[in-house]
From Swiss-Prot:
This is DNA translocase FtsK. InterPro entries: AAA+_ATPase, FtsK/SpoIIIE/SftA, FtsK_alpha, FtsK_dom, Ftsk_gamma, MFS_trans_sf, P-loop_NTPase, WH-like_DNA-bd_sf. Residues 1-22, 199-320, 331-350 are annotated as: Disordered. Keywords: ATP-binding, Cell cycle, Cell division, Cell membrane, Chromosome partition, DNA-binding, Membrane, Nucleotide-binding, Transmembrane, Transmembrane helix. It is found in: Cell membrane. Residues 282-313, 338-349 have a biased composition (Polar residues). GO terms for cellular component: plasma membrane. Disulfide bonds: none annotated. ATP binds at G482, S483, G484, K485, S486, V487. Gene3D superfamilies: 3.30.980.40, P-loop containing nucleotide triphosphate hydrolases, Winged helix-like DNA-binding domain superfamily/Winged helix DNA-binding domain. Belongs to the FtsK/SpoIIIE/SftA family. Residues 201-225 have a biased composition (Basic and acidic residues). Consists of an N-terminal domain, which is sufficient for the localization to the septal ring and is required for cell division, followed by a linker domain, and a C-terminal domain, which forms the translocation motor involved in chromosome segregation. The C-terminal domain can be further subdivided into alpha, beta and gamma subdomains. The alpha and beta subdomains form the DNA pump, and the gamma subdomain is a regulatory subdomain.
């Protein structure tokens, strides 16, 4: 007990001593800080002899930057006095760096103002002379500044000193303001990037405006010439660009409207020319020396004696190059397609009223925006709105449902922003979808100089859209059932038949559904009959891969790089050697339902598609793949990455839309041919109303083609007959029993074989591998049961 008391008493005595010591230090600190402040004030204002001496000393050391030294010393003194702590290291370093930067600035100013070129004499003597000859305010950076400049100018030149000064000044502000270098550099780069993007956008916008002005001038000239020739005024539903042309339905500003109606109104003016072009084509066909029994006007030309000798399924060979040209063959006339009927479209007064409703709706939700342009398309009308400055685009996008409610629309699609323009596009469905036919899409470019140009439909502005397969170079078409996918495929095939001859383009059609493409059996453009067996389809794709490799061998021996160069080489050889060596035709492979092929032979089909899409462009082979199940197990990453051009029809979810085109939007399409198209190298989608083609029109074109020339199938390209899987054997003695057991139970798994035959896991796994290799069972798909591909009654399902 006494010892404990002694310890506590000694602790109390120690605490008392430290407290007394702190109390004694406090007045000394205040006295020291007061003295420092007084000396700084005397020196800064040069008060008395002491003040002039202090200022002279600091001027000799720091020059014109001494005033910053006064301020820094004063701030540090006050901070230490009241906070009883030394300033943070980061800000202390920032103050020192700022002092150093000002030393460089002051000395550089003195250096340039006195035209100092070299300093051969010693620094101290030079500084002393300058100090004696110079008044206080103009004495450079003092002794320290002279030494620094004397050191750095020979090392990094005067330009390097200026750059270092700027960097020191920037670093000092970053340190003093306690900022992060990463944040500063990031914000700097972001500002530079945004400014460069803004500059590039403004340049693009100016170019587009100039282009639009040129187009408008050209259109005005054409309109004047047309008025003089026809002596008629423009129709009310032409493109309206003048405010006076609008019906006065309100006091608001009128909006220019561009639309699908323009295309319909221009059609009668050029109908005579088009009819004349078709008649000239028919007269030319009649003038050809042939033994036709019927006229071409009846669309049923008879074949020549040479064509009659060809069998419907004669076996040919493509071992050398291609097929010899048939001089008697003529492409089908466009008159085989039905003339589109004029339909009642949305009135412009109604469209303008909806534009005003749209403006008022946005204004009610606090969004200041103005409708600047309206485009009436076949299926939707696009309202182009320009938001005021400071309005976020996301705010307009979030009003999606409110806009649909105000316009009484089924659904609206917002394109924010429109690519290349400072505006937002709001696409509203029309009350009635205008039918777009393939004839009106093709008639402006028929016959096309490009062999693989096919018609797709009309865009929002009503302009016809056609694509060239050799530029795509491969196409993915996907959408739900009934969305217009099969009609699009028929339009592509019919466009090829209308534009090319059999020796120019060859087709390979794969139709596992067995009902969509069978109508094309027998046309001379086919390499082989339409493939409907999924097992044969994978073999047919392998044949295409072999043909691709063979063509590359031809390119190698002829020192050419692609099919165009090779055909030019063949034409040159024919002229020089007076030969008739045929040219290589383009090959278009069309798969109507990829999901069925992936289900039966997924790995083989995927590998073949990968090789074709990666290498076949130069060989003149192009692939079109269609599917109604746009899931990731059908459209795999490998297939998607190698097919750059895609068409998305209406789908059920945004996930499916992202699987097809890599972005949402297809889930808001209207169906019936409404599609989103993404071309090769494009990052934005184009909304198109697909061209409609009836079954009767397809049949008429097919009949015309078949009557002129029969199919000449290539035996080398035909897939082998499917192997009878019941005769396949395995090294395992239990294979036959396992085969019968699996097709009887219609299910298969490793554990099931283990229990049934009382074998180990390894042997059962080998049996499963043999069954999969022989295409008795499908591949494994996670936790899902394997699909059985055969049964007892019918060997192939």
């Amino acid at each position: 007990m006494p010892q404990a008391k002694k310890r506590t008493s000694t602790k109390r005595k120690g605490n008392k001593k430290t407290n007394k010591k702190k109390q004694n230090e406090t007045p000394l600190r205040y006295i020291f800080s007061i003295i420092v402040v007084i000396l700084i004030i005397l020196g800064a204002f040069q008060l008395g002899i002491i003040g002039r001496m202090i200022d002279s000393f600091f001027n000799y050391l720091f020059g014109m930057s001494r005033y910053l030294t006064y301020i820094l010393v004063l701030i540090a003194t006050i901070f230490i006095t009241y906070s009883k702590q030394i300033p943070r290291t980061r800000r202390s370093i920032g103050a020192i760096v700022l002092q150093l930067a000002l030393l460089f600035i002051a000395q550089l100013y003195f250096h340039f103002s006195h035209n100092i070129t070299s300093q051969r004499e010693p620094v101290l003597s030079f500084v002393y002379k300058a100090y004696e000859q110079t008044h206080f305010p103009n004495f450079g950076g003092g002794l320290i500044g002279f030494y620094l400049l004397k050191l750095f100018i020979p090392l990094i030149s005067i330009v390097g000193v200026i750059i270092i000064t700027i960097l020191l000044l920037a670093s000092s502000f970053i340190l003093l303001l306690n900022l992060r270098h990463r944040d500063v550099t990031k914000s700097l780069f972001d500002n530079l990037k945004s400014s460069s993007n803004h500059a590039s956008e403004s340049i693009k916008q100016k170019r587009e405006q100039n282009k639009i002005k040129k187009e408008e001038k050209a259109q005005l000239k054409e309109a004047k010439i047309e008025r003089k020739k026809q002596k008629k005024s423009r129709q009310n539903n032409n493109v309206i660009k003048d405010v006076s042309d609008f019906p006065e339905i309100s006091q608001s500003d009128d909006i220019p409207i561009y639309g699908h109606n323009e295309q319909e109104d221009k059609r009668p003016n050029t109908a005579n020319q088009r009819q004349k072009r078709v008649l000239d084509n028919e007269q030319f066909q009649q003038s050809l020396p042939s033994t036709k029994n019927q006229s071409i006007n009846n669309n049923q030309p008879s074949t020549t004696a040479e064509n009659n000798q060809q069998q419907s399924q004669a076996e040919g060979s493509i071992s050398e190059a291609g097929e010899e040209a048939n001089i008697e063959y003529t492409v089908p006339p466009l008159s085989l397609l039905k003339q589109p009927t004029k339909q009642k479209t949305t009135s412009k007064a109604e469209v303008q009223r909806k534009g005003q409703v749209l403006e008022s709706t946005l204004k009610n939700f606090g969004v200041n925006a103005k409708v600047t342009q309206i485009k009436i398309g076949p299926a939707v009308t696009q309202y182009e709105i320009q938001p005021a400055q400071g309005v976020k685009v996301s705010k307009i996008v979030n009003l999606h449902n409110d806009i649909a409610l105000a316009l009484a629309a089924k659904d609206v699609r917002i394109e924010a922003p429109i690519p290349g323009r400072s505006a937002v596009g709001i696409e509203v469905p029309n009350d009635k979808i205008s039918l777009v036919t393939l004839k009106e899409v093709l008639e402006d470019k028929f016959p096309s100089k490009y062999k693989l140009e096919v018609g797709i439909g009309r865009d929002i502005s009503g302009d016809p859209i056609s694509i060239q397969l050799n530029e795509m170079p491969h196409l993915l078409v996907a959408g739900s059932t009934g969305s217009g996918k099969s009609v699009c495929i028929n339009g592509i095939i019919t466009s090829i038949l209308l534009n090319t001859k059999p020796h120019e383009v060859k087709l390979m059609l794969i139709d596992p559904k067995m009902v969509e493409l069978n109508v094309y059996n027998g046309i001379p453009h086919l390499l082989i009959p339409v493939v409907t067996n999924p097992h044969k389809a994978s073999q047919a794709l392998e044949k295409i891969v072999s043909e691709m490799e063979r063509r590359y061998d031809l390119f190698q021996h002829s020192s050419t790089r692609n099919i165009e160069g090779y055909n030019q080489y063949i034409r040159k050889q024919n002229e020089e050697l007076d030969e008739k060596q045929p040219e290589l035709p383009y090959i278009v492979v069309i798969v109507d339902e990829l999901a069925d092929l992936m289900m039966v032979a997924g790995k083989e089909v995927e590998n073949a598609i990968q090789r074709i899409t990666q290498m076949a462009r130069a060989a003149g082979i192009h692939l079109i793949v269609a599917t109604q199940r746009p899931s990731v197990d059908v459209i795999t990453g490998i297939i998607k990455n190698n097919i750059p051009s895609r068409i998305a029809f209406a789908v059920s979810s945004q996930t499916d839309s992202r699987t097809i085109i890599g972005a949402g939007g297809a889930e808001k399409l209207l169906g019936k041919g409404d599609m989103l198209y993404v071309g090769n190298g494009e990052s934005t989608t184009t909304r198109i109303q697909g061209a409609f083609l009836s079954d009767q029109e397809v049949q008429d074109v097919v009949n015309y083609v078949v009557e002129q020339q029969k199919a000449n199938y290539v035996k080398e390209m035909e897939p082998d007959a499917p192997v009878d899987k019941s005769e396949m054997k395995s090294e395992d003695a239990l294979y036959d029993e396992a085969y019968l057991f699996v097709i009887e139970k219609q299910k298969a798994s490793t554990s099931l074989l283990q229990r049934q035959f009382r074998i180990g896991y390894n042997r059962a796994s080998r049996l499963m591998d043999d069954l999969e290799r022989n295409q008795v069972i499908g591949p494994q798909k996670g936790s899902k049961p394997r699909q059985i591909l055969v049964d007892l009654e019918n060997d192939e399902v």
